[in-house]
Amino acid sequence: MKMKYYFVIFFLILAMFLVGCGGGVTPATDEAKIKSVISEFCLAINDQNWSKAKSYCVYGSEEYYQACYIEDMFNTYHLYCDLVTINFYIDIDNVSISGDYSEVYGYLTLVMSACGEIYNDSGYFWQYLQKVGNTWKIYS
């Protein structure tokens, strides 16, 4: 009789764990999506994947053309230098969301080297994003 109760209790506990692990995926919050877009944008710049970097921007926006400018600058340096590297990082301090628009405050670091010269730029900045459909895109 005791063995029966153990099996029932074991089965109930197992059922509770399996229901808790039902495979349901928690949807990412808008803040997580925004941080991901900015992180992926930086990675695309670092990988020199210009089309991917621009895909994280609103087409024709200030940030879209900034990515085009970085690409042109990078390609121009490549005409004169064999090795050109770029490291672009953003450390996000705050994300504020208002409807389909978001403001991100953080610290930006850009290090580019070409022909033995190093170009550094860093400082605090504001980044602005717009929700297009279900996707956040950088516009300024």
What positions do the PLM features span?
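Generic cytosolic/nucleocytoplasmic N-terminal low-complexity/intrinsically disordered segments
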Residues: 1-3, 32, 130
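Sec-dependent bacterial lipoprotein signal peptides
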Residues: 1-19
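Short, low-complexity N-terminal intrinsically disordered segments enriched in polar/charged residues
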Residues: 10-11, 20-47, 55
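Prokaryotic Sec-type signal peptides and long signal-anchor helices
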Residues: 11-15, 45, 78, 92, ...
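Short solvent-exposed beta->alpha transition segments
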Residues: 35-36, 50-97, 101
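A generic structural signal for ordered secondary structure
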Residues: 40, 44, 65, 71-78, ...
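Exposed beta-sheet edge and beta->alpha loop/turn motif
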Residues: 82-84, 94-140
